[in-house]
Amino acid sequence: MKFDTVIMGGGLAGLLCGLQLQQHGLRCAIVTRGQSALHFSSGSLDLLSALPDGQPVTDITAGLDALRRQAPEHPYSRLGAQKVLTLAQQAQTLLNASGAQLYGDVQQAHQRVTPLGTLRSTWLSSPEVPVWPLSAQRICVVGVSGLLDFQAHLAAASLRQRDLNVETAEIDLPELDVLRDNPTEFRAVNIARLLDNEEKWPLLYDALSPIATNCDMIIMPACFGLANDTLWRWLNERLPCALTLLPTLPPSVLGIRLHNQLQRQFVRQGGIWMPGDEVKKVTCRRGTVSEIWTRNHADIPLRPRFAVLASGSFFSSGLVAEREGIREPILGLDVQQTATRAEWYQQHFFDPQPWQQFGVVTDDAFRPSLAGNTVENLYAIGSVLAGFDPIAEGCGGGVCAVSALQAAHHIAERAGEQQ
């Protein structure tokens, strides 16, 4: 099977790269083993929240300039501030075109409220998520009886420290009792599958309506809206106060929705989606990828002109830790890591951890190297890249988006030259 590009990994980076390549008229396939990290994320995307020295970032342009001085090997530093901002804006346009109408500005970070009621600097958020400063003084944090994925009293306690009048309440929907037989089934995603049925909408409205008359804003867990935000908008039009949603413990309704919107758009535009498959071997000839062998296609290889590695980091098994060191399991690419295992981590759990910055070694075009030699038609994007800490620096989503579009533009340019 011949393709212009085969992407190994179907997470945020892989999907955005595929969508951008389709804009250039290239035929793409995505091989994906299972659920991506988006299923376990908040659904919000960070661009740059803090510098390596811990200084918070609000002005993104100034932050990118400072980042280049502090971390010259960071993926952003390799591209330059203006290029990063341009690609981030293109990514936001691509997300909106896929149906993910996210709120945010590439020039200026905003503060979103987290499930614990604290504030986190971010780039893009779902419109349902409350953004600081809140537009209300009287707030009610509403939990769902029996839902362990969200603790209303914890969020309320944090918000009270910001001089807000915050109460808590709990709604009990007997219609959800079918899920209560097994506590492991009473999760936000399963509740959403039930509440998203239009016939159930009035039940949720009836439960929230008495609470809404006594406050200016309701904050509740994101336990509906798995396909779109239609129910949220329907409730906001009818309730006498604003309704906002906070992501829950994973799996996350907002994260799954974002992934599904991107995946459906990729397929709509003619992309080949290969779920439940796994790349077992990649054949390289004369420094280029010639064939990709997958578990489901056995002896029928995929033959791409270009290949993209978007396999993620440790969480997605894009990187594997062993006693001897860190390795990239598909091709055995060169990996940037510390000299000894003892240097992988810091003693204090909440300190920035060195292993977070491990990843494949690439050139400035994000082409990785194998035994010191660049693989000419292979690009590495997203969390598999080295040189950044997605947690401490708050840049995971941004690196995925920016590197994906950079690789896509580079591939499109080279594909045009080869025609």
From Swiss-Prot:
Pathway connected to this protein: Polyol metabolism; glycerol degradation via glycerol kinase pathway; glycerone phosphate from sn-glycerol 3-phosphate (anaerobic route): step 1/1
Q: Which UniProt keywords apply?
A: Flavoprotein, FMN, Oxidoreductase
Q: Which NCBIfam families match?
A: glycerol3P_GlpB (TIGR03378), PRK05329.1-1 (NF003718), PRK05329.1-2 (NF003719), PRK05329.1-3 (NF003720), PRK05329.1-4 (NF003721)
- Per the UniProt record, the source organism is Salmonella schwarzengrund (strain CVM19633)
Q: Which E.C. number(s) belong to this protein?
A: 1.1.5.3
The protein's name is Anaerobic glycerol-3-phosphate dehydrogenase subunit B
What is one GO biological process annotated to this record?
A: glycerol catabolic process
GO CC terms in record: glycerol-3-phosphate dehydrogenase (FAD) complex
Which SUPFAM superfamilies does the record cross-reference, listed alphabetically?
FAD/NAD(P)-binding domain (SSF51905)
Which family does the record claim for this protein? Belongs to the anaerobic G-3-P dehydrogenase subunit B family.
Cofactor(s) needed by this chain: FMN
Q: What does this protein do?
A: Conversion of glycerol 3-phosphate to dihydroxyacetone. Uses fumarate or nitrate as electron acceptor.
One MF annotation (Gene Ontology) recorded for this entry: glycerol-3-phosphate dehydrogenase (quinone) activity
| Keyword match Lipid biosynthesis | no
How does this polypeptide assemble, per the annotation?
Composed of a catalytic GlpA/B dimer and of membrane bound GlpC.
User: Keyword Flavoprotein on this protein?
Assistant: yes
Q: Which InterPro entries match?
A: FAD-dep_OxRdtase_2_FAD-bd, FAD/NAD-bd_sf, G3P_DH_GlpB_su
Tell me what reaction this enzyme catalyses: a quinone + sn-glycerol 3-phosphate = dihydroxyacetone phosphate + a quinol
